[in-house]
A protein has these predicted regions:
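Hydrophobic helical membrane-anchoring modules
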Residues: 2-5, 178-318
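Cell-envelope/extracellular polymer assembly enzymes that use nucleotide-activated donors
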Residues: 8-10, 39
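Short beta-strand/loop segment that forms part of the nucleotide-sugar
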Residues: 26, 30, 37-47, 66-68
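Donor nucleotide-sugar binding loop of glycosyltransferases
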Residues: 18-21, 47, 100
């Protein structure tokens, strides 16, 4: 099949401890894009294994490697790669071989020939354990209910962006979970397409059940500051949400006791429940204030929230 565009493509892949995946991933990307002009931008998020060494050993002229100075998380690794990207279209994907590079031409066709600013995947027949699928389903449900936007798979990393939209996404902390929503708020025309999904080739997943609480905190932040979306309030937000949930459970229990005819006014649990809810609200509010302060700091200083140690191409430092 002939390429659907002669424009340069930038494939941005954040990596953390993917030494056993990165060589095969590079091979699969090359096989999926014959005839295309592209650059592969690997962003090493301070891996503790031999990820960087194996990329440099490939000496692949298509590959750029960004070395971050410390572990910043997936969102800032994505931001670093997008900032460096030169392509007319920017493609993001995970480095664990669960996304299939052969889906990229089909997604590009939607972006190039139909004018979509963002083409995002919907993973079919997910090859993940319940530890990942259940939190993902809960997160997708919550996002749809709260935002009223029918995003079917927020967690799919395989996306094709128009360059202008990708460059306008100010990703902080771990906002990659809402990257489709953020693009929508920027006015992007979005297309969702089914894509293949594979079991992780090697290594271990970095996600677990705690993801649900992070999603709740992130959504509450998005709803509060909408177009100021920056860094999620995980430190204060998670604890605030947990305290409010515990306080709510205690109050539901006390309501049942009250309805059964017993007195609850002199029970210490009533006081504790109210204190938990108030403490949760206070923690969450502190988190919001800190988020706004952080955003003001970075924008006023014109600083990026990550630091690059070095960039190499084909194994040679630039």
């Amino acid at each position: 099949m002939d390429p659907v565009t002669s424009d340069l493509l930038s494939i941005v892949v954040p990596l953390y401890n993917e030494q056993d995946n990165v060589i095969l991933l590079t091979k699969k990307i090359h096989e999926a894009l014959p005839g295309y002009q592209y650059e592969i931008i690997y962003v090493d998020d301070f891996s503790t294994d031999e990820t960087r060494k194996r990329i440099d050993q490939m000496q692949d002229q298509y590959v750029q490697l960004i070395h971050l100075k410390k572990n910043y998380g997936q969102s800032l690794a994505l931001a670093a790669g997008i900032d460096v990207a030169q392509g007319r279209y920017i493609i993001t994907m995970d480095g664990d071989l669960q996304n299939d590079p052969t889906d990229i031409p089909m997604m590009l066709e939607q972006a190039v020939n139909h004018g979509f600013d963002l083409v995002t995947g919907i993973r079919q027949k997910r090859q993940d354990s319940w530890v990942k699928t259940i939190p993902s389903k809960i997160a997708n449900f919550l996002v749809r209910r709260v935002t009223k936007l029918d995003i079917k798979d927020n967690g799919c990393a395989l996306k094709v962006f128009d360059r202008d939209i990708a460059k306008d996404l100010n990703l902080y902390g771990e906002m990659h979970r809402f990257i489709t929503l953020l693009a929508f708020l920027e006015g992007a025309q979005i297309k969702q397409v089914p894509v293949k999904h594979h079991a992780r080739h090697a290594g271990t997943s970095k996600y677990g059940l705690e993801r649900v609480f992070k999603v709740i905190a992130d959504m509450m932040l998005l709803l509060f500051i909408r177009k100021y979306f920056q860094r999620p309030i995980h430190l204060f937000g998670i604890f605030g949400v947990l305290l409010m949930i515990l306080g709510g459970i205690a109050n539901i229990y006390l309501l049942g006791v009250k309805l059964s005819g017993e007195q609850i006014g002199d029970r210490p649990l009533l006081t504790l429940a109210m204190m938990l809810i108030l403490a949760g609200i206070q923690l969450f509010t502190i988190g919001i204030v800190m988020e706004l302060l952080i955003r003001t700091y970075y924008e006023s200083q014109q600083k990026r929230p990550y630091r690059i140690k070095k960039i190499s191409k084909g194994g040679q430092v630039q």
